[in-house]
Design a protein with these regions (language model features):
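An N-terminal, well-structured beta->alpha segment
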Residues: 134, 138-223, 227, 309-346
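N-terminal plastid-targeting presequences
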Residues: 33, 47, 116, 124, ...
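N-terminal chloroplast transit peptides
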Residues: 2-16, 31-32, 37-48, 52-131
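Phosphate-binding and adjacent anionic-ligand microenvironments
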Residues: 409, 448-629, 634-669
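Long, low-complexity Q/N-rich tracts
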Residues: 18-30
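Proline/glycine-rich low-complexity loops and linkers
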Residues: 226, 235-240, 287-321, 325, ...
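Gly/Ser/Thr-enriched, mixed-charge loops and adjacent short helices
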Residues: 251, 268-405
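N-terminal small/polar loop signature for handling phosphorylated ligands or for N-terminal nucleophile
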Residues: 191, 195, 203-269, 361-423
Length: 669
């Protein structure tokens, strides 16, 4: 190889070329760093937020607007400066958050015009904004969702549960419960649990029903819980009662547990139920957790990916073994103790929810023939019928299964198995008032003279049935937690109250941790059925022959169009009470308020010839709605009562109450 000597001028020329190359590289790198916001909107969000917060603002927002990443958009970076006290800025935090809220379907958009409006409202300057939009990918949406609206999180509270829309697919229902929100709720629950227990480290189990969004929300909750320092356990497919039992079962005893479920609601919904060893959380607890979660969502930086090290420990087999043991002890067969259901044919309709285990892990091991059971496989699309023991189609499907397989008993569960109904060998549906009557028969034999607590819409026939069995009936109010808590209150006061149950099928027994457990109720009925069979006594269906049932019944919902709907509904009820108490007013004929109105106003109506009907007007627990129930013992009785109530509503001119549903009851041919 030959080397040619360079002149001094050549050396300088080569050095100059190297310098030019280096300068070009530096310029390109700097340019790319400056335009990184075009490639990654998340960087802008975080940078501007940090800058604003460093300057003393409550909220900082960065925004990029233009075409899809990788193109050449009109782009601008905004910097928000505080121009008024932070307490005023907090009033507009929600508007700023909405600017960055992402659509949980995977597509989000940021609008500079909205940012300008928010900046104007808060008194903060925006350096420039073009008004065009940028669409970002699902991965970036997740990061951008850290500034989601905290108020939206608080609105997910549904009494003592959390409920929301987790999937798209139903027109008009946008997503309200996404992965980021689930992560925040998981972290908030872990925080709440540590404060509640005083422990620096807690273990939390998470179970789910088969809903399509369940695994996504589970992973996000794990991420949030782990971020708070909690140990997390994946309980897999579970039931709501099983999740509670995991907090009290020796050798398990999680500090808390969560069940991901939305009960019988459509496939796109999901939610959470929370437990400690003291039972399900109450409304104030859920409010606290939602407030904590809202703060986490507004702060941002939430992970939605399940951490490594999650322990998988399915709990359903343990729970099923507990139920088997209860049946063995309850039947106490002298000849078939281990298989007390030998010779019984029992079919289960799980509605493709979590209840299929009951056939495979409870009934079959105890000797029952479960052939004819249906919809046992978990399927979150619920392709066959709504998994709801109150649903007409679900009960009809259960009846067909019992009759076609010639079963002795059928059991219908809801999705998460905290409710159930049964069907006797003749195909008689035993749900609602009939289910309460059957369970009352069972517990009153074990606890003579005891009190049964129900919700407000139970029938007069049920009241007579309980009284005839020697029991006391307290007709309380709607909401299964209200019913259960009333029973707990009575027991604490020394009033024996073994059963607290809603007509929906939510039923709890004091002997079973005051837990609303559909599988436990089914177990009690199975034990009773086997005992009666062994003793050659009348069947469970025959027990209900003395239960008076209404000839007609109806329920309608009247929408209230008023911001303060609870106060408006209260005024309607007060006006109705005044009318009913007006002895000179012929509107309702021979009617009077029922005794012990704990909810709304229940009016007893004399229908003649010794027949008694009633109607109940009450406010919904959560919605801007008034609910009107009718029950009659005569043909056409509901129509007559509805017409009188409808005429009264017209006369009173309640302009913000949509009474069209009650008018339809008597105007329909």
């Amino acid at each position: 190889m030959r080397f040619f000597p360079l002149s001094l001028a050549g050396v300088f020329l080569l050095a100059a070329r190297v310098v030019v190359v280096v300068v070009v590289v530096v310029v390109v790198v700097v340019a790319r760093r400056r335009t990184r916001c075009v490639d990654d909107p998340v960087v802008i969000v975080r940078r501007a937020t940090r800058e604003a917060m460093d300057a003393g603002a409550d909220v900082g927002v960065g925004i990029v607007v233009g075409a899809e990443c990788g193109a050449h958009p009109r782009q601008t970076t905004t910097r928000i400066r505080p121009a008024q006290p932070s307490h005023e800025a907090r009033e507009h935090r929600r508007n700023a958050a909405r600017v960055m809220r992402a659509n949980a379907s995977g597509v989000g958009a940021v609008d500079a015009r909205a940012l300008r409006a928010t900046a104007s409202a808060t008194g903060r300057r925006v350096s420039s904004a073009s008004g065009s939009r940028i669409t970002v990918s699902r991965r970036r949406v997740r990061a951008m969702a850290t500034t989601a609206d905290g108020e939206r999180v608080k609105k997910l509270q549904n009494g003592s549960d959390i409920r929301g829309v987790a999937l798209e697919g139903v027109e008009g229902e946008g997503i309200t419960l996404d992965a980021t929100t689930a992560s925040a709720i998981g972290r908030a629950f872990a925080d709440w649990l540590m404060v509640k227990t005083g422990a620096r480290e807690v273990t939390i189990g998470v179970g789910r029903d088969p809903r399509l969004s369940g695994e996504m929300l589970r992973d996000a909750m794990f991420a949030g819980m782990a971020a708070s320092g909690a140990k997390v356990v994946d309980m897999g497919l579970a039931t709501t009662p099983a999740c509670f039992m995991a907090t009290v079962t020796p050798g398990v005893e999680y500090a808390g547990s969560v069940m991901l479920t939305a009960s019988h609601l459509p496939f796109n919904r999901n939610g959470m139920k929370f437990f400690t060893s003291a039972g399900g959380l109450d409304k104030p607890d859920i409010k606290d957790i939602c407030a904590r979660a809202a703060a986490y969502v507004e702060a941002g930086g939430l992970s939605v990916n399940a951490p490594s090290g999650v322990v998988r420990a399915p709990f359903l087999p343990t729970y099923a073994a507990q139920l088997c043991d209860i049946i063995r002890k309850g039947v106490n067969s002298p000849t078939h103790y281990d298989k007390p259901l030998s010779g019984m044919k029992i079919v289960v309709d799980a509605g493709n929810g979590s209840g299929g285990f009951f056939a495979d892990l409870v009934l079959a091991p105890l000797g029952a023939d479960t052939n004819g059971s249906q919809f046992l496989n978990p399927d979150g699309s619920f392709p066959n019928h709504s998994p709801n023991p109150e649903d007409k189609e679900a009960m009809e499907a259960g009846v067909r299964a019992v009759l076609s397989s010639k079963a002795d008993l059928g059991i219908v569960f809801d999705t998460d198995v905290d409710r159930s109904a049964v069907i006797d060998a003749s195909g008689k549906e035993i749900n609602r008032n009939k289910l309460i009557a059957l369970l009352s028969e069972i517990v009153l034999k074990e606890n003579p003279g005891a009190t049964i607590v129900t919700d407000s819409v139970t029938s007069d026939g049920l009241h007579k049935f309980i009284k005839a069995k020697g029991g006391h009936h307290l007709r309380f109010m709607r909401g299964y937690k209200n019913v259960i808590n009333k029973g707990k209150e009575l027991n604490a006061a020394g009033v024996v109250t073994p059963l607290m149950i809603e007509t929906s099928g939510h039923g709890a027994m004091s002997e079973n941790y005051d837990l609303d457990d559909g599988a436990y109720l089914a177990v009690k009925i199975i034990i009773e059925a086997v005992r009666r069979r062994i003793a050659n006594e009348p069947s469970i269906g025959q027990v209900l022959e003395t239960l008076e049932e209404p000839l007609e019944e109806a329920e309608v919902r009247l929408k209230i169009v008023d911001p303060d709907f609870k106060a408006y509904g209260g005024n309607v009820i007060e006006s109705l009470l005044e009318t009913v108490n007006d002895t000179d007013h012929p509107l309702f004929g021979k009617s009077s308020p029922a005794e012990d109105n704990y909810e709304g106003l229940r009016v007893c109506v004399d229908e003649g010839d010794g027949n008694k009907g009633w109607f109940l007007l009450r406010c919904s627990l959560h919605d801007p709605v008034m609910v009107l129930n009718f029950e009659s013992q005569v043909s056409g009785g509901v129509k007559i009562m509805a017409e009188e109530v409808g005429a009264w509503l017209i006369d009173q001119n309640f302009s913000k109450l949509d009474a069209s549903a009650v008018h339809a009851l008597y105007r329909t041919p």
